[in-house]
Design a protein with these regions (language model features):
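Non-catalytic cap/lid and distal C-terminal segments of serine-dependent acyl enzymes
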Residues: 1-146
Length: 146
């Protein structure tokens, strides 16, 4: 989150950054990463537009906003949704967003709660995973047709 926050702040804040992205001819990789952070903010806590869960200058957590983000975290949600449908989870062991750590915890909770799922950790990152469809789509097909 810190890199995205730095990029957004460089443009003068969320609204200025959004305006910049609307008017630029080409988005950089940093722009895309910052836009993903804005999209999460709008999705997880869109109460008053796009508001980040941290102070833009100190990166201190805004506990109220962060609690709204955490309501969408699978590790939080599983406590209230113990009857999940069968789930396929795969993640690269070198994921650049480091989601493998949270998914390992989710996998363990699913095991603890005896929720049926498939968990696969593969040699790779978050990108270039099209070949993983050869694993997930047959699994999904089987679930839908059984």
């Amino acid at each position: 989150m810190a890199d995205g926050l730095t990029h957004i702040t460089k443009h003068g804040g969320v609204q200025s950054f959004i305006e910049y992205t609307k008017n630029t001819n080409k988005l950089s990789s940093d722009d895309i990463q910052a836009l993903m952070l804005c999209a999460m903010a709008a999705s997880y806590d869109g109460v008053d537009g796009i508001s980040l869960p941290v102070d833009p200058h100190s990166c201190d957590i805004d506990e109220e906003r962060w609690s709204r983000w955490m309501q969408w975290d699978p590790l939080t949600m599983i406590e209230d949704h113990r009857t999940w449908p069968k789930t396929f989870i795969d993640v690269g062991d070198k994921d650049q967003y480091h989601i493998q750590y949270g998914l390992r915890k989710l996998h363990q909770k699913l095991l603890d709660y005896e929720i049926e799922h498939t968990y696969e950790e593969f040699d790779g990152t978050h990108s270039g995973v099209e070949y993983r469809m050869d694993f997930s789509l047959p699994w999904l097909y089987t679930q839908l047709t059984d």
